[in-house]
Amino acid sequence: MSFVKFEKQGNVAVLTIDRPEALNALNSQVLCDLDAAISQVEADDEVRVVVLTGAGRSFVAGADIGEMVNFSAIDGKKFGVHGGSIFLRLENLSKPVIAAINGFALGGGCELAMACDIRIASEKAKFGQPEVGLGITPGFGGTQRLPRIVGISKAMELILTAKVIGAAEAKEIGLVSQVYAPEELMDKALELANAICANAPIAVSESKRCIRMGMQTDIATGSAFEAEAFGVCFGTEDQTEGMSAFLEKRAEKHFQNK
């Protein structure tokens, strides 16, 4: 039995963290199942966009405290490296990932959402990095991604106070881009995913890569990445199709991921 469900809807893969009795808390097995799902998505040429969500009333309530409570320092580091490396794989996936945050996104759950490319949330969603209240630091990238997304001052406030915020404040600080009624969330996530799918897959993938790489370097180096990606696209059949459709005033496009 896998704790991460994989479902395809056209060119969209929907991954659901499915451990609702534990509010989808991340233990070692859930992390391994997520890693396997990422590999499945990467290998499937039909998948162009991923939507990640949680079963029940939680996105991911955090790492599993029941598993962590008796960790040694060595165990803790190994668990952090394990989760952190999987989240980095998700972040570096060639296909865009949309987090549809349906409920609690705390600790490791907030970190998982931040590893996604686009975050949208239910009005009932809750966000936070409450680890210092448990005597630990964020362990799956929270100290690195949160300040990059919301700025250093706000990240310090959220992490050092262990404050939990609602969806409206998460949107206000830029942690999520949109907030929807709970019953609308998945429809809106799929609508967004399909809007991305309508574009040239190689161009979408290269654009994601440039943004991600650019966030880690200076503008000059990032611009060099962009120029390389720009050139790569001119060697694709999809560039020919896209520009031909524009010149021919043709609304329908047939992108082949080539």
Show where each model-derived region lies:
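Crotonase-fold acyl-CoA enzyme core
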Residues: 91-202, 235-236, 241-244
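Conserved CoA-thioester-binding segment of acyl-CoA-metabolizing enzymes
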Residues: 1-55, 88
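Glycine- (often His-adjacent) and acidic-residue-rich active-site loop
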Residues: 3-5, 32, 46, 54-89, ...
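Acidic-histidine catalytic/liganding microenvironments
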Residues: 20, 44, 93-94, 236, ...
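Helix-loop "lid/cap" segments that line or gate small-molecule binding pockets
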Residues: 158-159, 210, 214, 229-234
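Amphipathic alpha-helical segments at domain termini/boundaries
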Residues: 1-14, 18, 163-195, 205-214, ...
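Terminal peptide-recognition signature
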Residues: 15, 19, 34, 52, ...
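Charged catalytic carboxylate motif
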Residues: 29-33, 82, 89, 188, ...
